[in-house]
Amino acid sequence: YNKMYPDYIAAINRLDDNVGKLVKKLKEKGLYDNTIIIYTSDHGSHFKTRNLEYKRSCHDSATHTPLIISGGMFKGGVVDDRLVSLIDLPPTLLDMAGIPIPKSYSGVSLLKEMRENKERDCVFIQISESQCGRAIRTKKYKYSVRTLAPTGYVAHNSDVYFEDYL
């Protein structure tokens, strides 16, 4: 934790500086008002404070990630605590562009959820790398299971899962 955290903070600061430069350049070129900016991450980190892995687990610190959308209907100044998943980004972008969302997509349009004031009651979490785990997350609870395989690389799915106490 102590060794990784300063580098993590430095990376966040560097990213913040570069997003600022990007926004400035978009405004200079007159493109900002016709641009959608999405800031997110594929995982969080608990810096190996919960298990031997630092990011690939179903622990909240590893699965709770930022999602900031600016542009289009997303005008900033709004904090929304609804449950979402990265799988929702493709349908959201298609919806924002006025393109029909294929029925085969698993995610939902966040734009549609906001327009219709809908909110789902849970999201599914799947980890299949260093650990093979699955979880269901509600706003209040999480139920998590994992395989006993040493890594998800060996067995990325299983017929048997065990409760994972996070």
Model-identified regions with their sequence ranges:
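Polar, surface-exposed loop/tail segments
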Residues: D33-T35, G77-T138
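C-terminal, low-complexity/hydrophilic appendages and adjacent surface loops
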Residues: S57-S61, S128-L166
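Active-site rim elements
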Residues: Y1-A10, Y54, F74-V84, A97-I101
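A long, amphipathic alpha-helix that forms part
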Residues: Y1-T35, M96
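A structural signal for well-ordered alpha-helical segments within the folded catalytic domains
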Residues: P6-I9, N13-G20, A62-T63, V84-P91, ...
